[in-house]
């Protein structure tokens, strides 16, 4: 992974998980006006690229967007950070014709970061072994690597690996967090790896415009873990935008979504075995403001 010191031009609104026509138009205009961008001093703006799967195992492909999704969700809750919406990254990927691997090719990442308006750009790769996430922190101004965080473990520990990476990133960004904030950031999106995988597949299906399939993945993720983050909001966003046929959706499922707590439920490490509901301030899918 690398962090690049770049130029910020970030929108203050969080755009949810749907790459809307407005977001696509933004990406098209941003690329067209790329040469006119001026260096603007701004603090603590971060964008997270998709991770590259170098394991040769296609079953790990959902982690490419999934790891980025979890990091973005967590970094959004770090006070003092501005986080670029994932949908803006996705729109740029489509507009610029990059695949997931193309984002991290030489010269592409700084360009993407500049258009996104990010001071720091986070990316990385998943390599062979159980799960090994190798990363580097690059200071572009100084042209030197200032850190190389790395986490590794079993697939069943994915949710813990992401937290380890999160706190390494926070350390390299030299962001001070209180013990209370640290404890809140330790809350898991889910400890159910199957549920996480279904969520990640739903995000990818949505990006591809297969909204009915995305809804099915979200529903399956919620059935696996009713307290999983993001999935409820993403499903309700699909419904609110009229992208799925709500009449075909199970009334029982919709009732379950309303009755099983808020969109912000997450699990603390202590709750991982207790399965006790704990509220967490994950932003809703629309109208979210960056701290």
Give the ranges of each region predicted by the language model:
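Short, solvent-exposed, polar/charged sequence segments at loop or secondary-structure edges
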Residues: 54, 62-64, 78-125, 129, ...
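Residue-level recognition of tetratricopeptide repeat
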Residues: 227-228
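Alpha-helical linker/edge segments of TPR/alpha-solenoid repeat scaffolds
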Residues: 239-266
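Catalytic-center loop of serine/cysteine hydrolases
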Residues: 24-33, 90-196
